Amino acid sequence: HMRNHLGSKPFQCSQCSYSCVNKSMLNSHLKSHSNVYQYRCADCNYATKYCHSLKLHLRKYQHNPAMVLNLDGTPNPLPIIDVYGTRRGPKQKPFSKMFEPQGPVSNNNQPQPPAPTHPIFGNHFPVNLPYLPPLLPHSFLFPPNNNYEQRTSPKNHEIQTEKPQQMSPPASILHQRLSYTERPLESGSTSPPPKSPPSITQTPTHREMPTEHGDDALDLTNAKTSEAGTPPPPTERATPVTPTTALKNRRKGRAFKLQPAALRLQHEDEKMRDADGSDSESDASAEVASSSAASSYTCQFCDITFGDLTMHTIHMGFHGYNDPFMC
């Protein structure tokens, strides 16, 4: 390109006054001084001095190229005419491919090393043909390899033996969860499950968790009849089961998260009862009931006091169990 700007034409023809800027133009010009037609058609008498002209002829008539000739007229088997390629000029066949024997000359007793040739097509294709359509199964395209099966079969057995072991820990965790949820029901007195619509069917785990919620909700209201750490029996429930509370208990299945707050309120109630030992038992129980009713609807995380149990329970449901301030 710079030679065109500078007007320099260093390539001169030895037979005439022609000069050009590159070697390829000079080679094309030298063909005009020769009578040898290097590129010929194998299906007809067409012959030309230029490779591009032969490609156009082969594309137009669907013919095949003949062997390329040298500048002196001798045949040259190395160049390959790529009819539909975009590269200008003939392709050069590598010397190693020309001098390789076509027939199988290796000894049968010696194992052949793995070569990147296809097992069916042999040396005709130097690659494994990734574009081959998957019309045949894998066993028909490739010969069986016992070493590969022996290497992969122990791993398959190990995977099959490890699967039951991997499945067993979730089963044990499930049994622990079921035993944990069934333990309060066995220890306490028998009571009917909370009311729920007959159309809704739930699993045993989800059916038992509202009862735990009912026991823990009792810790907030009936603190005068329960000791620290032991939930009162369900028969002494103070708040009646209304459709609103039944729906709320079914929706909120993790009410046992409020147990630390209930224990803290129970300890405060015990301290107040110890301080008022001179009063009668009826007066002490009334004061404890009134104080617990005033403080049982308070969120210990947000310092918010609610007017009734419904709003307090809905609010406490938004606090996480591990992290109360994480939604």
Curated annotation (Swiss-Prot):
Gene: hb
PROSITE patterns assigned: ZINC_FINGER_C2H2_1, ZINC_FINGER_C2H2_2
Domain of life assignment: Eukaryota
Record GO terms (molecular function): DNA-binding transcription factor activity; RNA polymerase II cis-regulatory region sequence-specific DNA binding; zinc ion binding
GO cellular component: nucleus
Location relative to the cell: Nucleus
UniProt KW keywords: Developmental protein, DNA-binding, Gap protein, Metal-binding, Nucleus, Repeat, Zinc, Zinc-finger
Region of interest: Disordered: 91-121, 143-170, 182-290
Source species: Manduca sexta (Tobacco hawkmoth)
C2H2-type zinc finger locations on the chain: 1-5, 11-33, 39-63, 297-319, 325-327
Protein known as: Protein hunchback
Family annotation (InterPro entries): Ikaros_C2H2-ZF, Znf_C2H2_sf, Znf_C2H2_type
PANTHER family for this protein: ZINC FINGER PROTEIN, ZINC FINGER PROTEIN PEGASUS
Function: Gap class segmentation protein that controls development of head structures.
Record-level GO BP terms: regulation of transcription by RNA polymerase II; segmentation
UniProt feature, compositional bias: Basic and acidic residues: 205-216, 265-276
Record-linked SUPFAM superfamilies: beta-beta-alpha zinc fingers (SSF57667)
Family: Belongs to the hunchback C2H2-type zinc-finger protein family.
